[in-house]
Structure formats: C-alpha cells, structure tokens
C-alpha cells in the first residue's frame, strides 16, 4: 500500500510529512528546504514556477506572481494571467502538485492520497475548496483536519497518561485560530474553537511595508506603493526584518536603487527596532485576545483549567505574540516542536491513524459555525450549533406555511445571526411532490449530516409521501474574504437588533396563525355558533388583521389576545350547551379548536410552523 502524506497547506509556506518507523518525518523539497513557499509564478515563455524559485523572481515579475492565495479559498476570487482566469483552488493545486512531486521523489513511489489541514475556523465552502484543490492536484484527500488538532498530535500529547486540557494558539501567515482540546486515553476532543481567517504574518509584514513607504514618501515625496517592483522589494525586506526582529532588538533595512527621480537614484537605508515594530503591530496582537476569551468561554473553562499551551505557526516566533499568550494564559508556552512543521507532522500522524499504522488515537473535531435553515418569517432555525463534535447527524421536523403547498425550498445557512439573510448561504434546494394539505399538516424532516471533514450534506423528506431531496454543500465561491470571522462579530454587534426582529416575527406569525385557526374552526362549527357570537368573533378577527402587518407589537399582541379570549368564551358556551346532563361540564377541559397562542395548547405551531423533534446520531 502506498504511503499517505500529511500536508499543511499554508498561506505563506506549506509543509509535508510522512510516517516512517512509527514517527512523523518532514520531507525536504527539491531545493533542500523543509518548507515550501505557497507562491506560484508565470513566466513570459509560459513556464510555471512554484515554491522558492517563484518567490525569488517575484521582484522582477510581480504582476504574474501569486502569493497568499489561501486567503481567497472558498470565494469567487479569480486570478487573471495573460487573459486566463484561475480560481484559488487551481492555484493551490499547483502548490500541492509541487509538494506531491517532492514527496514522491523522497519516497520513490507514487503518492495518491493525503490528509490536508485547514484553519479550525474555515467554513464549509473553504474546506470544500481545499478538498477540490487536492483533487485537482491528483490527490485523494482522505481527511480534512483542523490545524490546532494536528499540532497537538505532533507535540506527542496522545502519549500522556493523564487527562489534559490544551490551549492551542495558531498564528500563521494569513489565518489565526485558537482551540481548546481535551486529551485523554488517546482521544483528542476539540471543546471549542474561535479565530480570524484574515489575520496573520502577512498583516505584520504590511505594517512594516507601510512604515517604510510612508517614511520614504515623507523624506522624498515619492510613493513607492505605486511602483509594483519597488513594492515587491519592500515586501521581501519587511518579511526579512520581521524575522530578524524575533532574535534581535534592531535590524537594518537596506534597499539601494529602490527608485529614481530627476535628481538621480534613491536608496533606502534605515533601522527598525523591535520596540517600533511592536508599536506598529500592537493592534494585530490585540486582535488575538478576544478569540482566546471566546474559545475559553465556549468551552466552559477558565484559564486555570488549562494544563498546557501550544504555539503553532511561524508568526508565533514574534516576541510580542509570545508575551501576549503568556500574559493571557499565565503559562510558558511549549516549544518542543518547530511551529512551521508541527501541523504537517500531525497530519501525517492522522494519515497513519487512517491507514492503521497508528493505533489508539481518536480525533474528535468540531464545526466552527452554527448550521440551520430559513423558516417562516426569514428566521434562521439552527439544527447544529457551533462547536458541535463532528461527525454528527441531526434531524428536525418542519411543515408547510400555506394551505395546499406542494413544494418547499430549503435554504441552508451557516452563521450566528438570528435572521437567515444575515448569515452565509451555503445552498438551496427544493422538495417537490408534497401532497396538498392544510398548512401545518405535512411533516417534512430536514436532516443535516456533517462528515469528519466538516463538509455538509442536507436532505429533506416528506414523511407522508416519502418524497426526498438532498444537497451536498460544495464550494459556492461567493464568499468575501472576511465573511467567516464577521459572522460572530456581527452576531454580537446586532444581537439586540436581531432579538427585536425575531420577536416581531414571532408575534406576527402567532397573530396570523390565530386568525387562520379561528376562521377555520368557525367554518367547521357552522350553525352551532349564533349569528351574534359569529359577528363578535369576526369583528375581533378584523381587528387583528388591521394591525398584524404593522409595527406596533403591543397592539398586535392585544388584538390577538382579545380574539383568543373571545373565542375561548364562545367555545366554552358551545361545549356547555352540548354537554350531557350530569356531566362535569368540560367547558374548560376539552378541545380548543382555535387554541393557537402557544400558551395553553402544547400542540400549537411556533415560528417554524410545526412541532419538531431532534434526533442526534453522532
């Protein structure tokens, strides 16, 4: 059986490892380096360069050099090279092809299968895009796993005898994640995850670039940001300065002949201290604090519950980052494994688990964002809450919103907002062939199934006719770059507004339902209701209809309650008249054909217009 490789497909650098003799081994690339820049370049003669050679010539060929494409995964972003458009998946596949070739050269055999890691906070579209990139590169992706989980594996946490709670801080080239894992008896269970898919080492580089460019402009009146070749040289110098400041308190930035004007050539020769670098990047470090707090809170833990802290990603070499983590956790982070290599090593261990080479290890990851569907009134009804352990499967029964409805559209959303329109649309599909019936009668079972890769399948089944429809959520390619981390931030910002909107919809839905049930029951009772009582009810019905589409919620509630009480009174009178002599009356114990307020009849419809039950199958 051929080897299964573990790949850390990074924003700035990628790494590959394989299990040998029971241990993960990092595979060096054809240039002899243990990591490969995630850079692709196209030459004038049509040749394509990948990795270090592509990065080296980026200064002279900035227009046709693609960097940090991982930030665009799962979006509709396209790269235009000589009139041909490339998707992020295609560019990533070029990096994977290079990694695959290097692994094959090392192993001396063809490689067809891999485990690839992604940031824990990647959404469904981004995960699917990563899997597609592997397929394009000729790799069967056996599993997509979260980077922090892979890192914990690489640190040998599975060999611990006692239960441990691990705090994983992962700051890479373009993404940031923090995860809380509970480990014991070879089981790795992710308790919570949080992060920012648009924060990483690239942002630290940009701060230095801006500082150099602004200083140069102030001194010389020339904006280097308008010169692509000069800007590429600034990027290289900024990255080099950042790395040097991790071990030195000061570095020199020397860029001769950066540009020229009428007075002659211009040069950059300046110093950058670690103190100044820390000042420039303080806001970036601060952005990592809130996700740490949220992850702890979601896990139901305090910092005192944490046994060990792990740093992952090259950007964690920055002293200010290390200090921030130490200050927050009160613990010295573990530094036993190279932060650039540990994720690939963990992926290789997981590959070993899947092939049976590694025994007694079980990974239990979580889904980063809530999954649900749109229900009556545009409400997002959750089926699987964020931080639910995967793989998982959950079902819930819904119904129709109109009489005689023969089809329903299932709108699948992902996010933390209470209204469907404010969340990320993952897909839509239609279930047809529902037998015509009064609204609320058909039973439509919607099932969400998330596999171990975090990829979603959704199905809907009419329990009456047996008709079924389903969708596998694939990369929708319409994500904006910051959409995933905006989901939770917006949920907090608009939480109060969301609550009010949801309350408004629930009140209006209830009013509409009370009117519907009252008119239906009135029609069913026919002559049993006196003309005087019928007129009283119809007046109350009209009163509700007049206000139910307005914005005065108190007026809607009052009119609905008035109608309900009037109907109760008349219902009681009818049952009293029909009761047999000697019976106990039953006026207040019997059926309430129009009871729909949700306060007195447990069978009433709520905002999703149906009863439901939840079946968990993990």
Swiss-Prot record:
Residues 576-618 are annotated as: Disordered. PROSITE patterns: HSP70_1, HSP70_2, HSP70_3. One of its GO terms (molecular function) is ATP-dependent protein folding chaperone. Induction: By stress conditions e.g. heat shock. The gene is dnaK. This is Chaperone protein DnaK. Acts as a chaperone. Residues 583-597 have a biased composition (Gly residues). Belongs to the heat shock protein 70 family. It comes from Clostridium kluyveri (strain ATCC 8527 / DSM 555 / NBRC 12016 / NCIMB 10680 / K1). Keywords: ATP-binding, Chaperone, Nucleotide-binding, Phosphoprotein, Stress response. InterPro entries: ATPase_NBD, Chaperone_DnaK, Heat_shock_70_CS, HSP70_C_sf, HSP70_peptide-bd_sf, Hsp_70_fam.
């Amino acid at each position: 059986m051929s080897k299964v490789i573990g790949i850390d497909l990074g924003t700035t650098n990628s790494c590959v490892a394989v299990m040998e003799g029971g241990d993960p081994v990092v595979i060096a690339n054809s240039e002899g380096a243990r990591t490969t820049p995630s850079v692709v370049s196209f030459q004038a003669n049509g040749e394509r360069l990948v990795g270090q050679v592509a990065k080296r010539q980026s200064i002279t060929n900035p227009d046709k050099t693609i960097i940090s494409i991982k930030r665009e995964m799962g979006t509709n972003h396209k790269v235009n090279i000589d009139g041909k458009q490339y998707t992020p998946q295609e560019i990533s596949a070029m990096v994977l092809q290079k990694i695959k070739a290097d692994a094959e050269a090392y192993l001396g055999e063809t490689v067809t299968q891999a485990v690839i890691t992604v940031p824990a906070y990647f959404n469904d579209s981004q995960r699917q895009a990563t899997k597609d990139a592997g397929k394009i590169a000729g790799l069967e992706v056996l599993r997509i796993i979260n980077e922090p989980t892979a890192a914990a594996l690489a640190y040998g946490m599975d060999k611990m005898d006692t239960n441990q709670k691990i705090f994983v801080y992962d700051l890479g080239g373009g993404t940031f994640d923090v995860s809380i894992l509970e480990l014991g008896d070879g089981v790795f269970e992710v308790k919570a995850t949080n992060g920012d898919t648009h924060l990483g080492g690239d942002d630290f580089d940009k701060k230095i670039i801006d500082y150099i460019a602004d200083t140069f402009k102030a001194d010389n009146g020339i904006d280097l940001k308008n010169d692509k070749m000069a800007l590429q040289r600034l990027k290289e110098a900024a990255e080099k300065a950042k790395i040097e400041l991790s071990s030195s308190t000061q570095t020199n930035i020397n860029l001769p002949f950066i540009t020229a004007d009428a007075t002659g050539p211009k040069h950059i020769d300046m110093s950058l201290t670690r103190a100044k670098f820390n000042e420039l990047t303080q806001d970036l470090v601060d952005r990592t604090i809130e996700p740490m707090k949220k992850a702890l809170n979601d896990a139901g833990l305090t910092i005192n519950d944490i046994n060990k802290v792990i740093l992952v990603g090259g950007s964690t070499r920055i002293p200010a980052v290390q200090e921030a983590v130490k200050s927050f956790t009160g613990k010295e982070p573990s530094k036993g494994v190279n932060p650039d290599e540990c994720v690939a090593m963990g992926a290789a261990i997981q590959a070993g688990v899947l092939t049976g080479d590694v025994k007694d290890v079980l990974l239990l990851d979580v889904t980063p964002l809530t999954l649900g569907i749109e229900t009556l009134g545009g409400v997002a009804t959750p089926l699987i809450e964020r931080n639910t352990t995967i793989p998982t499967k959950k079902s819930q029964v819904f119904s129709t919103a109109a009489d005689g409805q023969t089809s329903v559209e299932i709108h699948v959303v992902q996010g933390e907002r209470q209204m469907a329109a404010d969340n990320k649309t993952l897909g839509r599909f239609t279930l047809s062939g529902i037998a015509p019936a009064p609204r609320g009668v058909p039973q439509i079972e919607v099932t969400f199934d998330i596999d171990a890769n975090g990829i979603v399948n959704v199905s809907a089944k009419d329990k009456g006719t047996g008709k079924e429809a389903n969708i596998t959520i694939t990369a929708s390619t319409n994500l904006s770059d910051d959409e995933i981390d905006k989901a939770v931030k917006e949920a907090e910002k608009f939480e109060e507004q969301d609550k009010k909107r949801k309350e408004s919809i629930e009140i209006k839905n209830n009013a509409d339902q009370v009117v519907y049930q009252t008119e239906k029951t009135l029609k069913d009772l026919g002559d049993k209701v006196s003309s005087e009582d019928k007129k009283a009810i119809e007046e109350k019905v009209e009163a509700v209809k007049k206000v139910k589409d307005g914005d005065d919620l108190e007026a809607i509630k009052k009119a609905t309650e008035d109608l309900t009480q009037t109907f109760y009174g008349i219902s009681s009178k009818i049952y009293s008249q029909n009761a047999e002599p000697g019976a106990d009356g039953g006026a207040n114990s019997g059926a309430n054909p129009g009871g729909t307020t949700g306060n007195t009849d447990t069978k009433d419809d709520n905002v999703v217009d149906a009863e439901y039950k939840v079946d968990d199958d993990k």
